[in-house]
C-alpha cells in the first residue's frame, strides 16, 4: 500500500508498505542482477549503507542457478540472506535484447540461453511463475521493450500485445498467490508503460493500464537510445496519467542528475547498473562532480572519496590507497569504490548538488 506523504508540484514523498518492510520514496534500488551486487558487496554491506530495496533479474536467475532451486532454498530472501524488499524485473528486457536469438508470438517469446544456447520459452505466465518461485516482494509484468526508434506501427502492435500480456500476468499472479506452497503469497505486481518515443501511444497505454488497479506502475523503454531531453519529455507527458496514489518506477535510469529530474516529474523508484559498473573501474560520482581514480593527481590524495560520506570505505580509506588497489587489480579496490557510489546514489534525491 502506498501512502502519499507530501507533494510539491509533481514531486512526491511517500511510503510503500510491503510484506518485507516499508519503503520510503523516492528510492534508488541497488542492482544485484544474479542476487549479488558486483564488486564483492554483501547484503550486510547493503544494510550498513542504508539500502531499502534490492533488484534482481528474473531471466538470469532462471538460467542460473534456476528459480526452482531458489524456491527449494526458501526463496530469494533466504537464499541471499536479505530481509528487506526485493524487486525482480520480468526478464523481458534481457529477452528482447537478444535480437538475433528470439522469436516473438502472442503466447510469448522463444529464445536461446546466452550461457549454453538451449531453447527457452517465456511468456506472461512463465515470467510470473519464475518470479513466484523467487518469492520477490515486487514482480514486474512481462512486456516487450521496443527499440526507441522503432517504426510506429511496430510499436503500436507491441504495446497492444504488452497490454494483453499484462492482463495475463495479473490473472496468473492472483492464481499463484493463492497456492499453498507459494513462497510469498503477498507478492505485488507492477505494470509497465511502453511506447518508445511516441508520446500519444504512451499516453493511451498509460490510461489503459491505470484502469487495472495494479500495485504500482513503471515507465519502461527509456534510456535505450533516446536523448535525455526526449526521456524527460516523455515523463512530462506520461506520468500525469499514472495514479498519483501508487508508486511510479522509472526503469533502468539512475544517474544523480536523472534521479533529480525524475523526482521532479513524480517518479518514486529508480534503478541503474552504471553507478556500480563505473565505480568498479574507478569512475565515481561525488558531490563535487565525477572523479577518475586512475588519474595521477590522486596518487598522494589523503582524502576519502567523498568528504562526509557515511560508508565504510570513506570512513577509513584514502583516495590514494584505493587508487593503488585498483592499479594493482586487487578486488578490494573495486569493493571500496562500489560502496561510496552506492551510498551516494541512495541519497541522490536529497540534494540538488549534482545539477
Regions found by a protein language model. Give the residues of each.
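Glycine-rich nucleotide phosphate-binding loop and flanking beta-alpha elements
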Residues: 60-62, 94, 225, 276, ...
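Non-catalytic, usually N-terminal nucleic-acid engagement modules in DNA/RNA processing proteins
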Residues: 1-183, 296-299
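Conserved small/polar residues in nucleotide/adenosyl-binding loops
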Residues: 344-351
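Cysteine-cluster motifs in flexible loop/terminal segments that predominantly coordinate metals
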Residues: 287-335
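Glycine-rich phosphate/ribose-binding loops and adjacent secondary-structure elements
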Residues: 163, 172, 176, 188-305
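Glycine- and acidic
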Residues: 148-152, 156, 216-222, 331-334
Amino acid at each position: 500500500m502506498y501512502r502519499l506523504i507530501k507533494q510539491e508540484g509533481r514531486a512526491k514523498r511517500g511510503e510503500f508498505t510491503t510484506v518485507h518492510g516499508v519503503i520510503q520514496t523516492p528510492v534508488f534500488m541497488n542492482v544485484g542482477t544474479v542476487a549479488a551486487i558486483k564488486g564483492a558487496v554483501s547484503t550486510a554491506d547493503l544494510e550498513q549503507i542504508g539500502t531499502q530495496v534490492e533488484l534482481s533479474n528474473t531471466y538470469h536467475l532462471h538460467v542460473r542457478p534456476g528459480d526452482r532451486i531458489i524456491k527449494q532454498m526458501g526463496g530469494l530472501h533466504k537464499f541471499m540472506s536479505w530481509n528487506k524488499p526485493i524487486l525482480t524485473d520480468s526478464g523481458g528486457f534481457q529477452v528482447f535484447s537478444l535480437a538475433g536469438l528470439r522469436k516473438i508470438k502472442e503466447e510469448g517469446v522463444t529464445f536461446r540461453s546466452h550461457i549454453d544456447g538451449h531453447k527457452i520459452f517465456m511468456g506472461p505466465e512463465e515470467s510470473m511463475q519464475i518470479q513466484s518461485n523467487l518469492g520477490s516482494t515486487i514482480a514486474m509484468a512481462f512486456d516487450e521493450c521496443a527499440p526507441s526508434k522503432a517504426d510506429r506501427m511496430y510499436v503500436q502492435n507491441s504495446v497492444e500485445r504488452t497490454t494483453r500480456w499484462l492482463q495475463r500476468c495479473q490473472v496468473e499472479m492472483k492464481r499463484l498467490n493463492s497456492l499453498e506452497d507459494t513462497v510469498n503469497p503477498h507478492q505485488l505486481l507492477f505494470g509497465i508503460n511502453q511506447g518508445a518515443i511516441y508520446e500519444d501511444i504512451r499516453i493511451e497505454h498509460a490510461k489503459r493500464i491505470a484502469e487495472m488497479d495494479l500495485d504500482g506502475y513503471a515507465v519502461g523503454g527509456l534510456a535505450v537510445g533516446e536523448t535525455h531531453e526526449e526521456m524527460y519529455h516523455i515523463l512530462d507527458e506520461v506520468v500525469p496519467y499514472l495514479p498519483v496514489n501508487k508508486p511510479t518506477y522509472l526503469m533502468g535510469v539512475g544517474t544523480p542528475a536523472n534521479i533529480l529530474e525524475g523526482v521532479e516529474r513524480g517518479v518514486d523508484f529508480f534503478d541503474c547498473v552504471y553507478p556500480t559498473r563505473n565505480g568498479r573501474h574507478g569512475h565515481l560520482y561525488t558531490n563535487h562532480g565525477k572523479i577518475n581514480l586512475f588519474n595521477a593527481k590522486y596518487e598522494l590524495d589523503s582524502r576519502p572519496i567523498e568528504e562526509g560520506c557515511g560508508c565504510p570505505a570513506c570512513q577509513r580509506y584514502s583516495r590514494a590507497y584505493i587508487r593503488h588497489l585498483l592499479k594493482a587489480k586487487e578486488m578490494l579496490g573495486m569493493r571500496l569504490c562500489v560502496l561510496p557510489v552506492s551510498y551516494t546514489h541512495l541519497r541522490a534525491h536529497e540534494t540538488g548538488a549534482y545539477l
